[in-house]
Amino acid sequence: MRIKDCILAIDQGTTSTRAIIFAPDSSIIAVAQQEFTQHYPNDGWVEHDPEDIWSSTVVVCRQAISEAIAKGARIAAIGVTNQRETTVVWDRNTGQAIYNAIVWQDRRTAKTCREMQDKGLFDVVNSRTGLLLDPYFSASKVAWILDNVEGAREKADAGDLAFGTIDSFLIWRLTDGQVHATDVTNASRTNLFNIHDMAWDPKLLEVFNVPKSVLPMVKECADDFGHTTEDLFGFSLPILGVAGDQQAASIGQCCFKEGAIKSTYGTGCFVMLNTGTKAFNSKNKLLTTVAYTIKGETHYALEGSIFIAGAAIQWLRDGLGVIKSASETEDLAKSLDDDHGVYMVPAFAGLGAPHWAPDARGAVFGLTRGTTNAHFVRAALESVCYQTSDLLHAMAEDGVSLDKIRVDGGMVGNNWLCQFLAGILDVTVERPKIMETTALGAAYLAGLKAGIYASCEQLASMNEVESSFDAKMPSSQRRKLIAGWENAVQSTLGYTK
């Protein structure tokens, strides 16, 4: 049976690269995944080898394409989604990175960002980008590479270096150096892009000391990003959609209307609220960012960023050996009648919104001789829900009210987590039928540009909810649990002072 107009979605994440091929009805034809090594050269530093990212991308794409073709699929286009903010600088002549990719979790430029803040530069950055002066974003990472790799500044000034987030690096490699481009969502996460003018900002380039010569061209999310070379997959494919992972997940969840909100639970957790065609400025340390630009119309989003979500479970598995697989966590959490006062604050890479404390470090409170592995697991899962509650509280302070939230990401296959989340948030939690919403969003963008889908309205009509979790927690219990969490967070912040 022939399946025409399939889309290959490349989902390049923090810990693995996935290739998923979707049929036009959004059903999955083929999936391939490969993890790659995380590098921690110093305290608070996180790096990836760009060659690991590239090789894993080629491997999973070839595997998925082979499987899909064997099933009679014809692939029409590629959509790309990626870990945002992670920064690569490479030589335009050789295509080789001059330093490892500095990952979004990396905190090495915290001092630089504090010094810039002390110089009164916060408003200069925030008013243009909607972001904060934080090492999370790309600008200070680019500057660090240019300042710390011998000869890099000279090469950049000569026009021999290119900077990009992971999407740009992959597009460069996929097109054999023919296209140096990014999309508006990834550009909006660099601290170099003016989200009101929708262009690279000369003042920000001056402030961060980043030369314009290294920057990629900025395109819409559903746009022409060039073609792959035939030698990669045996035939050339157009790259027609690009978005950062959280924006792609929002698109995959069909959050096209103002007020639609989703929360993605992967390595980190990211809550994104569509605020329509106007940028909404938070007074509670939430980020204003670009949700997407499609067919000339830009929508903005209010975003809360949590650095550690699924990464806490990964730490329990790989760092402490508490579990062998993430699949064990649901049964372990359910094995306890309550949390017994154990709280985990997973500030392994500082705390994100709404605290923005880059120097914070992780802690576990309430340990006794009776504490078991199950308590650690439950505390880790609960910490994700409490952090989400912090974000929604900040949104409420900004005047946003909601009665439901759409969730996605690898963690939400855990029913216990979804039910606890609904209780702590006091809202209905909706889980989609297709869990791969990040990759699906990239596929939707490519499909829109390819003409497979006519409009965002058509995509919204295809969206299906698999499960709903209603809030069942008594308000007194909710208040008690959140008070315990807030005490744990304040104790953690106090430790770092």
Curated annotation (Swiss-Prot):
Pathway: Polyol metabolism; glycerol degradation via glycerol kinase pathway; sn-glycerol 3-phosphate from glycerol: step 1/1. Key enzyme in the regulation of glycerol uptake and metabolism. Catalyzes the phosphorylation of glycerol to yield sn-glycerol 3-phosphate. ADP binds at T14, R18, T267, G310, G410, N414. Its EC number is 2.7.1.30. The gene is glpK. GO terms for cellular component: cytosol. It is an enzyme of class 2 (transferase). Sn-glycerol 3-phosphate binds at T14, R84, E85, Y136, D245. This is Glycerol kinase. It comes from Pseudoalteromonas atlantica (strain T6c / ATCC BAA-1087). Glycerol binds at R84, E85, Y136, D245, Q246. GO terms for molecular function: ATP binding; glycerol kinase activity. CDD domains: FGGY_EcGK_like (cd07786).
